[in-house]
Swiss-Prot record:
NCBIfam families: ruvC. One of its GO terms (cellular component) is cytoplasm. This is Crossover junction endodeoxyribonuclease RuvC. Its main location: cytoplasm. Belongs to the RuvC family. Mg(2+) 1 binds at residues 8, 139. PROSITE patterns: RUVC. The active site is at 8, 67, 139. It catalyses: Endonucleolytic cleavage at a junction such as a reciprocal single-stranded crossover between two homologous DNA duplexes (Holliday junction).
């Protein structure tokens, strides 16, 4: 049994999703959003760190998975996203959790079957895979998708290599 915490980072809203993996079965444990109220970036980062730390304390995950930064047209937004990721990662590392990172396209591929899926498709498949009665908030659904991707990808890596290792896993430890 493995409890996986997935994070969809954002400087204003950071989604989190927690699932339990038992063999091939995935079970929903919880999800939500950490909403920052601070106007300055340092204040937001502090709130993200505190929020992720609280989720870790509440759910006691075994592993932590987070979406990588996507570089769009706005470099400033990408930098803020990177800072939010860093804040969440530090919370995980301080709790001695192994950290895994996944590109957005890989997450969509693992959950929906295509790397070009839109948010509605991701939400639908997250509900289907985890047998949720209703749609979670968009950022929480994305975080659950990160956790599902980790469950599927990590399982495949173990099967292929015969051990729990990955080029990116645990590089922050």
């Amino acid at each position: 049994m493995t409890i996986i915490l997935g994070i969809d980072p954002g400087s204003r809203i950071t989604g989190y999703g927690v699932i339990r993996q038992v063999g091939r079965n995935l079970e929903y444990l919880g999800s939500g959003c950490i909403r920052t109220s601070a106007e300055d970036i340092p204040g937001r980062l502090k709130q993200i760190y505190a929020g992720v730390s609280e989720v870790i304390t509440q759910f006691q995950p075994d592993t932590f998975a987070i979406e990588e930064v996507f570089m769009g047209k706005n470099a400033s937004s990408a930098l803020k996203l990177g800072q939010a990721r860093g804040s969440a990662i530090v919370a995980a590392v301080n709790a001695d959790l192994p950290v895994s990172e996944y590109a957005a396209r890989l997450i969509k591929q693992a959950v929906v079957g295509t790397g070009a899926a839109d948010k509605a498709q991701v939400q639908h498949m997250v509900c289907s895979v985890l047998k949720l009665p209703g749609k979670p908030q968009a950022d929480a659904a994305d975080a659950l998708a990160v956790a599902i991707c980790h469950a599927h990808t990590h399982k495949t890596l173990i099967a292929m290599s015969g051990k729990a290792s990955s080029a990116r896993r645990g590089r922050y430890r």
